[in-house]
Amino acid sequence: MKRTFLFLCLAMPLGAAPPESFWRALHAVESGGKLGPIKGDKGAALGPLQLHKAYWQDSGLKGSYSQCADLAYARAVVSAYMQRKAPLAWAAGDCRTLAMVHNGGPQALKAEGQKQANLETYWKKIQKHL
């Protein structure tokens, strides 16, 4: 068991990230590639990656929520969030899981019914841009 854990730790590069195509797809789907303080989800989401305040808070990133309007900062928020909430998917560059967690939260892969259908629809939108 210890050897397996050690192998997994050594096999996963620290700070690995999804491919650049994932970021472009996320940006395209979330805001149509727009930049700036874009409001979405009835004013509950902000910026080019449409981040909610709770998502930003869960990321643990220092700064202010208003900084999510900046694409580079928004990417840093998503990176920090995924490394906390979906570290294996992050390390593997698993775009499907990352997209679903981004859209549906850490429990997205356990979703059922309509929520699962909505997440699959979201993933198909992301796939079109990969």
At which residue positions do the language-model features occur?
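Short acidic/histidine-centered micro-motifs embedded in hydrophobic/aromatic stretches
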Residues: 3, 29, 101-105
